[in-house]
């Protein structure tokens, strides 16, 4: 088939010069290009969507004097390599081999899975209309800019007489335009960004170097144009490195009622890139050619057609009536002085493979048909559609058959400027964002494969300065959900990621699971001679086992052994004793009156170098002249011989847990914790004493210095079972931003994060579904409680959660481990039974 080259299509680019976000065209017109940031609005946040549409309509209505505007959503290359290079600067030297392997695996897997990794960016193009264009500028245009680009090839083109400062009189106008568009928070682009946006249709789908492409245009405007061909109804772009194919698909019809259609968001369901180009023109409302005149003539035709349809009993009547209703609605809008626009939508999927492009086109057209959106293939119009959809090209002769008329408010029902990203821009891959409301029915891999919206995590970004759009400085994070939903998997994955960067990491493992599991994996990898970087990583972890039956551990959690601050030592000592005896009992009140001075006394002795412990205090109080005090002290001294309490009550002769290692997992054997909502038994109170000590141990760990520290505390729900526990938790949460400390609580309910007398928040929350706690979880996550949001959360499959990030964005997350060597470390249920493999 004969090719239609760009030279035969009768269209050319008219760009003359660029300055910041201003573009000079050869017909004297000047345009401003603004980058429009997107807002993260969950698909189940109806109120947030309505607000965004109102803001968007308010901004667009302010452009009526400009007569038209252009809106582009471009799929820009998401180059992850520079991001990982930035992240690698924070890798800890002792574990960097594993960190590098994980990042390389992510890059390789994404390259195999997706042709393009991209991020959608919105750009608004506005013509700057002014009556103050200088006559000198007009004259210079008339004299020398008839066709500048063709003249540039000649030597004397370099000396054409036009003002090099043409942009000066437009800068104030552009600044005023930014203020008019303040609802959209527009960004004035740099000249490099402006050139790159203008070049995008030429570069679509090609392998490029951005700086190289931009610098060519900066050197000479003649370098703006690039070779393209049109063949068999598609556009072919080429450079030295690659070839790309694209197809321009104009929208022929939208549904008659587009309320809540959210067309732009619907397009996010595709894992391949789709550029969207929109030209919008404000319609005049006066004159015979105005929209009112056209509408009146159409109404008369509808009336005659309806009469004819009635006479012939025609089935055409329904469609004619619907068209008449739309015409009447348009008249009402004009009467209400609403702004009317004609707009033209063009969708442009692209690929480096022609067969893949055709598959994508078919998939897109089938999808749009399901939503009653008709697309045109426009086989003979590809060249004109290509060139007319460049930014700043406001003549759309090739679009005449694709005109959509609506009010500005109706136009905004397409839901522009929605950001579907979650998490940080620099970090480790945590999973994929899931935009489905329905259930994946247990197939978490299908959920992962269906999304190319990557979610990254960085534990210390929240308290860093100059991070745009973040809404919290709090480093703390919570993982919540019932057993079996995936919270342990996520907790271990986050622990591994945190331990790969320059920080000190502590994991409190009350269930004593991790050491056994990690060592088992290490032995397997050693035997099979695989994943050496994982073996080295496991070797770098200091596994501490606190066994109350081992005399070497006696006093490991004694406040006098590890609480450096006198106040912390006294508070913990009182908290532990209060758990064992009733502090509200009158007799015990006498004991606490003597206990506090005794603690202070032995803290003073410790400061002088004496070896003291909790038993030293109890033994001292057995000699108290008050019989009730002595009796209680003898009781506590006797209890200290209990194997579990021996971890916290000692003579101070043994050392505390050593945390010299950068990565530590501390497990406790023999703990008997109460069930959630149940009063603790006598034996369970002893376990709680140990857990309180561990809580203060985290406080000591996090506040020791100003370097980055992270603590993971599993089974943290127990803190809420007693008043003493709640106070310990409150103290733990207060060690945060100023100390560069992050606390991660793994628990069963969002209520475990809340307290009436404590307003310390959590920067991130990962909530796995708990069927009987749907409403309270959604409320805590700041998600409106509706039937859709309930279904959205309830339908999370195993391995999915609803995540709240430091930017205040909430979305459904499919958790993903990107590296096979880590999977056995994360699995909480392992079996060698063949019949348990459901894949058979």
What are these regions (language model features)?
Residues 111-113, 557-612, 754-840:
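P-loop NTPase motor core of the ASCE superfamily
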Residues 306-307, 460-485, 489-495, 506-522, ...:
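Conserved P-loop NTPase motor cores
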């Amino acid at each position: 088939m004969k090719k239609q080259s760009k030279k035969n299509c009768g269209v050319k680019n008219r760009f003359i010069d660029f300055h910041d976000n201003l573009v000079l065209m050869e017909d004297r017109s000047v345009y401003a290009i603004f980058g429009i940031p997107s807002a993260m609005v969950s698909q189940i946040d109806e109120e947030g969507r309505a607000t965004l549409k109102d803001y968007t309509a308010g901004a667009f209505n302010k452009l009526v004097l400009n007569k038209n505007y252009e809106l582009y959503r471009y799929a820009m290359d998401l180059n992850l390599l520079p991001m990982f290079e930035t992240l690698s600067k924070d890798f800890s030297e002792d574990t960097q081999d594993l960190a590098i392997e994980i990042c390389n695996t992510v890059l390789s897997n994404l390259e195999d899975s997706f042709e393009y990794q991209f991020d959608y960016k919105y750009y608004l193009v506005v013509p700057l209309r002014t009556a103050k264009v200088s006559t000198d500028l007009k004259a210079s245009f008339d004299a020398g800019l008839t066709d500048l680009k063709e003249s540039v090839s000649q030597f004397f083109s370099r000396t054409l007489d036009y003002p090099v400062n043409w942009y000066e009189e437009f800068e104030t106008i552009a600044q005023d335009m930014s203020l008019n568009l303040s609802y959209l928070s527009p960004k004035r682009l740099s000249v490099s960004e402006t050139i790159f946006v203008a070049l995008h249709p030429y570069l679509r789908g090609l392998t490029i170097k951005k700086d190289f492409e931009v610098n060519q245009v900066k050197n000479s405007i003649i370098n703006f144009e690039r070779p393209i061909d049109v063949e068999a109804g598609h556009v072919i772009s080429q450079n030295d490195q690659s070839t790309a194919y694209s197809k321009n698909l104009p929208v022929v019809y939208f549904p008659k009622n587009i309320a809540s259609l959210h067309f732009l968001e619907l397009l996010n369901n595709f894992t391949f890139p789709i550029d969207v180009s929109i030209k919008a023109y404000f319609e005049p409302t006066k004159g015979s050619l105005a929209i009112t005149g056209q509408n009146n003539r159409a109404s008369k035709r509808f009336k005659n057609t309806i009469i004819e349809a009635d006479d012939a009993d025609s089935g055409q009547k329904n469609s004619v009536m619907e068209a008449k209703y739309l015409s009447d609605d348009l008249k009402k809008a004009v009467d209400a002085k609403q702004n009317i626009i004609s707009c033209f939508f063009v969708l442009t999927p692209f690929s480096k493979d022609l067969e893949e492009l055709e598959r994508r086109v078919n998939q897109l057209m089938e999808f749009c048909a399901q939503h009653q959106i008709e697309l045109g293939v426009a086989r003979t119009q590809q060249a004109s559609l290509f060139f007319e959809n460049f930014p700043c090209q406001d003549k759309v002769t090739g679009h005449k058959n694709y005109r959509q008329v609506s009010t500005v408010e109706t136009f905004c029902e397409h839901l522009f400027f929605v950001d579907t990203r979650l998490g940080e821009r620099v970090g480790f891959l945590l999973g994929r964002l899931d935009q489905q409301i329905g259930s994946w029915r247990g197939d978490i891999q299908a959920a992962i494969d269906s999304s190319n919206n990557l979610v990254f995590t960085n534990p210390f970004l929240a308290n860093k300065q100059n991070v745009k759009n973040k809404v919290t400085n709090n480093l703390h994070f919570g993982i919540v959900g019932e057993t079996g939903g995936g919270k342990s998997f996520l907790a271990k994955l986050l622990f591994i990621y945190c331990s790969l960067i320059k920080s000190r990491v502590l994991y409190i493992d009350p269930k004593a699971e991790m050491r056994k599991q990690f060592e088992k994996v290490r032995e397997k990898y050693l035997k099979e001679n695989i994943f050496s970087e994982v073996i080295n990583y496991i070797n770098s972890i200091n596994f501490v086992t606190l066994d109350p039956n081992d005399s070497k551990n006696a006093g490991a959690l004694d406040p006098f052994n590890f609480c450096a601050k006198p106040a912390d030592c006294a508070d913990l000592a009182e908290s532990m004793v209060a758990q064992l005896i009733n502090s509200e009992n009158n007799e015990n009140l006498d004991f606490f009156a003597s206990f506090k001075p005794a603690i202070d006394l032995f803290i003073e002795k410790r400061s002088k170098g004496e070896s003291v412990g909790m038993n030293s205090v109890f033994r001292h109080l057995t000699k108290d002249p008050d019989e009730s005090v002595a009796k209680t002290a003898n009781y506590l001294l006797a209890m200290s011989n209990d194997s579990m309490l021996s971890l916290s009550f000692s003579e101070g002769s043994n050392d505390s847990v050593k945390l010299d290692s950068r990565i530590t997992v501390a497990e406790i054997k023999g703990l008997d914790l109460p069930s959630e909502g149940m009063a603790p038994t006598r034996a369970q109170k002893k376990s709680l004493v140990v857990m309180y000590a561990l809580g203060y141990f985290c406080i000591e760990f996090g506040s020791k210095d100003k370097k980055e520290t992270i603590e993971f505390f599993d089974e943290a729900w127990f803190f809420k079972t007693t008043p003493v526990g709640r106070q310990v938790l409150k103290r733990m949460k207060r060690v945060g931003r100023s100390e560069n400390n992050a606390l991660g609580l793994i628990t069963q309910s969002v209520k475990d994060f809340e307290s009436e007398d404590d307003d310390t928040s959590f920067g991130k929350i990962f909530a796995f579904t708990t069927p009987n706690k749907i409403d309270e979880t959604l409320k805590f996550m700041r998600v409106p409680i509706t039937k859709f949001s309930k279904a959205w959360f309830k339908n999370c499959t195993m391995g999915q959660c609803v995540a709240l990030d430091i930017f205040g964005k909430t979305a459904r997350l499919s958790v993903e481990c990107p590296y096979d060597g880590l999977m056995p470390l994360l699995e909480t249920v392992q079996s060698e039974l063949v019949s348990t493999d459901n894949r058979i």
